[in-house]
Amino acid sequence: IVLMGTNDFNAGIPIGEWFTETEEQVLAARGEMKKMETCKKRTPVMDSNTYKGRINIGITRMKQLFPDKQIILLTPLHRAFANFGETNVQPDENYQNSCGEYVDAYVQAVKEAGNLWGLPVIDFNSVTDFNSVTGMNPMIEEQLIYFYDSGFDRLHPNTKGQERMARTLMYQLLALPV
C-alpha cells in the first residue's frame, strides 16, 4: 500500500510527464503484408526530479522486487493549514505550491498511475467534491475531530482519523484480489 503525494506537493516537485516519445522503425502488418513502419514509441520517464517520474521509478522497482504482490495506490488526503515552526508553515489546499500546482494535480497523477500501471487506487481525496472514501476533510471545521490539532496541524490525522482510515482501507482491500 503506497500513500504518496502530499510531501511532493509541499516540496513543489514539478508534476512532469509520464512518457517520452521517439520515432522508431518497427515491423507491422495491419491488414496488409508485413513491413517496416515508422511509429511513435513511448517510454516511461524515470526522472526523480518530477512527480510522475518518481512514481514510474517507484512502481517499476516495486514490481521488480515484489512481482507476486498486489500494489495499491492511495491518493493524498485533503490538506489544511499546518504550522510546524518558523521554517515549515504549509498553507491549505486552496493555495498553489511553489511550482504553481494545486494538490489536485498530485491526486490526479496517482489516479492516472493506477490506470497506466494496472494498479488499484483507493481515493482518499476526491478532486470533484468532498466525497472521498474516508469522508475526512480538514477544510471543513466539523471534520477537525479527525485531525491532530486545529490550531497548528490540520494536515495529519489523529488517532480517531487514523482509525477511520484503517477501517476504510480494510473494507476497500476486501474487494481486491490477494
Segments from the language model and where they lie:
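Alpha-helical cap/lid subdomain in secreted, periplasmic
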Residues: 1-177
